[in-house]
């Protein structure tokens, strides 16, 4: 980042993604979390942070401030965008990590309260300025963007896979199933919700679910628009996800090793974002990986003449790392604008 001053980030939501963002920022040299909006009690928020990270002694609670060796963050008992006075804290950007406020009007509320720019941790509900997936469409970012989504962990993994393979081979169509750890909006016991299947216990069931990634491909990866279907199976594990993708190639000559070689090369082209493994790993082996996509070469098989099935791994902290990459991307654009 060209700017010598740390990027001042405001954070709404201190759930799993919020805590991962905070921990990653505390180990960076260019980002500071200056304010955190969450209705949790400060002692409990600090307790949850320390319970799931290494070197928890780095983080202390001093009154209403979370403190680490790099910066201190004010904890504010607020949970709605329209109630949070971001202007008081002089933030450069706000990350909404709640997963709840995905409409443009919610993002506008952040802007109205002093956030120069707001980035969603999830896909939006309606039209916003930009969806940016690092490694896929970084070049689409514009300094005028104010309401931005960084996609989701699943959409990032899928778009990276499709971009890499479609740059090497002609793809007819594809279908993706994410075998996904349960999420915080699922109930541990059967509980009447808005969706029949998601009303069943997350701890006891494999739960089929829809996924919206394919609906946004026209913005993120236009060449794959209308060629992909996406689906999710939520399973009873805490962390670690598997992307099971079936790709129909136009050229029947494309084989298993062609695909594996393409992904091995991509690991060099996308350092820190894409990797590969030749080991027979399972979901717990990917926990803690900050990659957006870890390609499993042992999972590549061919069915018939044109269908290639691939397996790729990812976990939520990889998406948290990409959120901070999007923060850096826009900070760099701002700095270039100032120089110009």
Model-derived features with residue positions:
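Glycine-rich beta-alpha junction loops
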Residues: 39-42, 124-125, 152-154, 178-185, ...
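Active-site pocket-shaping loop/turn-to-helix segments
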Residues: 205-210, 281
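N-terminal Rossmann-like NAD(P) cofactor-binding subdomain of oxidoreductases
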Residues: 2-188, 192-199, 333-337
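Oxidoreductase and adenylate-handling cofactor-binding alpha/beta cores
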Residues: 156-175, 212-229, 326
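C-terminal active-site/capping subdomain that shapes the small-molecule cofactor and substrate pocket
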Residues: 230, 242, 246-340
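Short, flexible turn/loop "capping" segments at secondary-structure junctions
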Residues: 140-142, 198, 236-241, 302-305
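Glycine-rich phosphate/diphosphate-binding loops and the adjacent beta-loop-alpha structural elements
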Residues: 194-205, 237-248
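A short glycine-threonine-serine/GTX helix/turn-capping micro-motif
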Residues: 148-149, 201-207, 229-235
């Amino acid at each position: 980042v060209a700017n010598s001053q740390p990027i001042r980030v405001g954070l709404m939501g201190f759930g799993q993604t919020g805590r991962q963002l905070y921990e990653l920022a505390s180990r960076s040299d260019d980002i500071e979390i200056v304010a955190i909006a969450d209705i949790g009690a400060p002692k409990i928020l600090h307790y949850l942070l320390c319970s799931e990270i290494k070197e928890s002694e780095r983080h202390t609670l001093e009154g209403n401030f979370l403190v680490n060796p790099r910066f201190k963050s004010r904890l504010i008992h607020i949970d709605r965008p329209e109630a949070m006075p971001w202007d008081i804290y002089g933030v450069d950007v706000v990350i909404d990590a709640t997963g709840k406020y995905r409409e443009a009007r919610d993002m506008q509320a952040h802007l109205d309260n002093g956030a120069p720019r707001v980035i969603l941790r999830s896909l939006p509900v309606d039209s916003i300025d930009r969806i940016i997936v690092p490694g896929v469409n970084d070049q689409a970012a514009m300094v005028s963007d104010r309401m931005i989504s960084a996609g989701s962990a699943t959409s990032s993994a899928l778009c990276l896979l499709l971009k890499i393979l479609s740059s090497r081979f002609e793809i007819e169509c594809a279908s993706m199933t994410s075998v996904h750890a349960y999420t915080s909006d699922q109930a541990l016991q059967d509980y009447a919700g808005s969706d029949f299947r998601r009303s069943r216990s997350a701890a006891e069931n494999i739960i089929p679910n829809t996924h919206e990634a394919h609906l946004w491909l026209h913005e993120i990866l236009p060449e794959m628009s209308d060629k992909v279907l996406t689906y999710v199976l939520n399973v009873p594990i805490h962390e670690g996800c598997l992307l099971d993708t079936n790709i129909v190639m136009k050229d029947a000559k494309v084989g298993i090793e062609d695909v594996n070689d393409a992904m091995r090369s991509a690991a060099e082209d996308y350092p820190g974002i894409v990797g590969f493994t030749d080991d027979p790993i399972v979901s717990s082996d990917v926990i803690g990986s900050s990659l957006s996509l870890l390609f499993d070469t042992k999972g590549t098989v061919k069915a018939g003449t044109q269908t290639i099935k691939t397996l790729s791994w990812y976990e939520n902290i990889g998406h948290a790392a990409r959120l901070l990459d999007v923060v850096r991307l826009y900070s760099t654009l701002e700095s270039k604008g100032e120089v110009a």
